[in-house]
Amino acid sequence: MLSALFKKIFGSRNERLVKQYAQNVKAINALEPSMQALTDEQLRAKTEEFKQRYQQGESLEKILPEAFAVVREGGRRVLNMRHFDVQLIGGMVLHAGKIAEMRTGEGKTLVATLPAYLNALTGKGVHVVTVNDYLARRDAEWMSRLYNFLGLSVGINLSQMPHGEKQKAYAADITYGTNNEFGFDYLRDNMVFTAEERVQRGLNYALVDEVDSILIDEARTPLIISGQADDSVDLYLQMNSIAAKLVRQEKEDGEGDFWVDEKSHQVLLSEQGHEHAEALLAEAGLLAEGSSLYDAANISLVHHMYAALRAQSLYHRDQHYVVRDGEIVIVDEFTGRMMAGRRWSDGLHQAVEAKEGVTIQKENQTLASITFQNYFRMYGKLSGMTGTADTEAYEFNQIYGLETVVIPTHRPLQRKDYMDKVYRTAKEKYQAVIDDIKECQKRGQPVLVGTTSIENSELISKVLSEAKLEHQVLNAKQHEREAHIIAQAGRPGMITIATNMAGRGTDIVLGGNPEGEIAEIEADEQLSEADKAARIAALKADWQVKHDAVLAAGGLHIIGTERHESRRVDNQLRGRAGRQGDPGSSRFYLSLEDQLLRIFASDRVGAIMERLKMPEGEAIEHPWVTRAIENAQRKVEGRNFDIRKQLLEYDDVANDQRKVIYQQRNELLEAADVGETIAAMRVDVIHDLIATYIPPESLEEQWDVPGLEKALQADLGLEIPLQKMLEENPNLHEETLREHIVEAANAAYKAKEEQASAPVLRQFERAVMLQSLDNHWREHLAALDHLRQGIHLRSYAQKNPKQEYKREAFALFSSMLDTVKREVTQVTMLVKVQSEADVEAVEKHPELENVQYQHADFDEALGNAEESDEASDQSVKTFERAGAKVGRNDPCPCGSGKKYKQCHGKLS
């Protein structure tokens, strides 16, 4: 109550921020006449002036009013678009490293030009991040006219782009691209063999479009670069037929072999299921007689068994994937787009291929991975814009430290959002949807029908076809025609069916969008200028008639056929209507058979319907019901937030290690000479070897000198007569022995240096270190995955799984670095190097020639970690640094508590 009173007196924080930014808007508006008086050349010269002022120490905040005024004037001259005052506020919010929530149709693409221009003045690069290649190309081509006019260069970073073009795109002042491509380029840059091969030049400022889609929806799915592993295709087929013979339990503790937990997206074998599965595996010859499914040798069988069960019970055709040209193509559950070339990891994709009877492709091995959460937190400054961020403001603040500011609309919102209608069955619901569509058609009102899956969109399409109603379908199977369909969805009486609308990027203009037809007329060389002008005028007049007719009919009507598990996605669908103050309306039609209601709210809503004795075909429409559904959505959102937070807490451990490895790699690439590092490694390896055979502070009787002689010969190629030395000098101390062995090793390596030229040997050393580091890092990633998948079981032993994971991951990491040192020392000591051909043999990286780029399914990425206990949040430091690198005397980032130079800094 007190907070409400304070808010009434002082206004909310959002209102106070908007008022604060409005003061700057006045300053920008005051500069407008002077900017209009400048010639094009004088306006362009302002960019160079701003750059010099920044170099001389003036802050971007001081330059902001003038810079924004320049961009506004440039937009007016080049694009015939003048930034509104609220768009200037949006630009300031984005420059401040915050999230701007702007309604659909408020001109987010134009707003982005303001902070992009201002931050490009630093010369460090600006990354404008979009959700797909089409939008990246469209926005870059559209806005590059303005940037080029003002003297800035623009690059487009697309997938499958040649290496040289990518480097050129990143060298530009402003680079447009997709979140996936920026992330994959970062990973690829940390897999190269020379510094010149890298494409990115540091992570300065990222401006993320559809920020909720990228930083929240896709945060559960790590980016993974993988290569094919050697698994038998037959195993997937056998597992598929065995899984099909297992019986699903109707209740969690009922009869059957396995239980499907739809809430946590997991499958669990029962005791009976274990026995049945073992019998079937033994029958198929996959399990030795008398052995258990959980013997160490059979762990991979458990992994494949669960993958097959999940493929059959949790992944459904035309909802989670489609079958196209004999391949399984994943469908993005948030945008409804097909994600061609993406594959689920950990054998799940192969299990789905076996289930659908298509060609099974081999399982992948992870070469490098990172989550969007950890990638985007590496930028010096991060900001984003979206139409729907307020519902996720808490998560943006918690995970990314980003504040959300709701920007006022240019014109007041006129859309009417009606209460949900809830029916008993899906059949009744769809009949009500058809009736509503028919009513809209009679009025000439355009309708957009939103669905949560391809299956539902095709079901409604079928019913509309039977009712002889013309319509357009927009889903992942049709995205080639996507922009055209959306552009015309506002025509009178038009019916458009669409899967989730996030990231579509094209506004629905009431009366239809004539821009495409106008462009065709202008491009027609056979028409005279007079004919073109006449046709365009007629087209615009026709559009105005249609536009007025749609306004009179009530604007665009949105029909939702199911509530999504996130309120934000529902709001995105609603937000398609009522753009820029247009009229519009929206209503959701639901049934107790819908997935969200069935899992979370059917009992409560069903009880209300029972009490009211609702007849068939009648809907319940009440604020209580809408509130119950919103509470169900909040539950799912809360659970999904916990999953993402959980994933981040686990990935933070890998991220600290990734930071150390990538810093080592970059130092190796940039170092002119790694000879000192090799020598330090050699000393460490010799000390470890001596400690194995001559334990510290041990008696001479406990020394295994013959064993040490053999180890030095086998591992380092050193023939040192240690026994003879001890016989000749019985008082020889352990330290003297150590010094003698190190001197002998150094002498042997110096002799090797004299045989090969110094540049060739330095190149060889660098190649060996990079190759060894890459190979063992890859194996370490697989080990971390396996550790994470089973770590939740520690909770049964009253241990905190997260702390256990952190402890064991550190032990694995330390062991990996010891292995790298040992391997590098062995190779450099034992391999003969005579020419550059020997170096090239080491530098070959065959696994990079046949790689795939994918999002892992979030459950696979997380394993069963959501079952584990809560642990405290970890502060995250990341490799691509905005500040100074880790100093030699600083605490090691791995969390050991030692100084960096005494821990993982030893490697460098």
UniProtKB/Swiss-Prot annotation:
Recorded catalytic activity of this chain's protein: ATP + H2O + cellular proteinSide 1 = ADP + phosphate + cellular proteinSide 2
Mode of membrane association:
Peripheral membrane protein
The entry's ATP-binding residues are 87, 105-109, 507
Read off the SUPFAM superfamilies from this record: Helical scaffold and wing domains of SecA, P-loop containing nucleoside triphosphate hydrolases, Pre-protein crosslinking domain of SecA
Region called Disordered, residue ranges: 860-898
Record SMART domains:
SecA_DEAD, SecA_PP_bind
Q: Which CDD domains match?
A: DEXDc_SecA (cd17928), SF2_C_secA (cd18803)
Localization in the cell: Cell inner membrane; Cytoplasm
- Which keywords accompany this UniProt record? ATP-binding, Cell inner membrane, Cell membrane, Cytoplasm, Membrane, Metal-binding, Nucleotide-binding, Protein transport, Translocase, Translocation, Transport, Zinc
Any Gene Ontology biological process? protein transport by the Sec complex
Alphabetized Pfam families for the sequence: P-loop_SecA, SEC-C, SecA_DEAD, SecA_PP_bind, SecA_SW
An MF annotation (GO) of this entry: protein-exporting ATPase activity
Q: Which GO terms describe its cellular component?
A: cell envelope Sec protein transport complex; cytosol; plasma membrane
- Chief location: membrane
Cofactor comment: May bind 1 zinc ion per subunit.
Documented EC number(s): 7.4.2.8
Q: Which domain of life is it from?
A: Bacteria
Cofactor needs: Zn(2+)
Concerning InterPro entries, the annotation shows: Helicase_ATP-bd, Helicase_C-like, P-loop_NTPase, SEC_C_motif, SecA, SecA_CS, SecA_DEAD, SecA_motor_DEAD
Q: Which residues bind Zn(2+)?
A: 892, 894, 903-904
Keyword presence, Metal-binding: yes
Top EC class, one word: translocase
Which NCBIfam families has this protein been placed in? Answer: PRK12904.1, secA
Q: Quote the subunit structure annotation.
A: Monomer and homodimer. Part of the essential Sec protein translocation apparatus which comprises SecA, SecYEG and auxiliary proteins SecDF-YajC and YidC.
Q: What does this protein do?
A: Part of the Sec protein translocase complex. Interacts with the SecYEG preprotein conducting channel. Has a central role in coupling the hydrolysis of ATP to the transfer of proteins into and across the cell membrane, serving both as a receptor for the preprotein-SecB complex and as an ATP-driven molecular motor driving the stepwise translocation of polypeptide chains across the membrane.
What is this protein called in UniProt? Protein translocase subunit SecA
Q: Which gene specifies this protein's sequence?
A: secA
